């Protein structure tokens, strides 16, 4: 199974590293060059060319939003993607937050492009440290179940 990974916290975010470890294999990362939290489903328009920089093997940084990253990844960088995964976001994306979330926008754009997606977020209480290794383990367990569940065109999961 081939995954396109993205997020809204930047290509070098610890949550994205944990997600990469959870899929353990056939993935390409296309994520924002800079932090894009709260960018919602904003996309770059005409006269604003996006720059794509290779940051490592199968890791690309885009000078745009999470939705831009998903679109660029699916259209220009990665062929035959089975799933788009976004996250692991630092903070929850619950209720109305999903409309503001760049993390969720990454998989919403995947749904617009005809690909299934899952957005992952790590809720924590103020002052508590995030355990990315543990979060990656939970993502792996959730993936084992959700990847077997069929999604209708235009649908995605938010975990």
Region spans (language model):
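Glycine/threonine-rich flexible loop motifs
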Residues: 92-101
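A cross-family phosphate/adenosyl-ligand binding-site feature
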Residues: 3, 14-80
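Short glycine-rich anion-binding loops that position phosphate/pyrophosphate groups of nucleotides
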Residues: 9, 35, 65-66, 89-92
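Hydrophobic/aromatic beta-strand patches that form the interior of the parallel beta-sheet core
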Residues: 28-30, 60, 85, 116-120, ...
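Glycine-rich, Lys/Arg-enriched anion-binding loops that position phosphate/diphosphate groups
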Residues: 111-158
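Alpha-helix C-terminal capping segments
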Residues: 73-79, 105-116
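Redox-cofactor binding/interface segments in oxidoreductases and associated redox assembly factors
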Residues: 5, 86-87
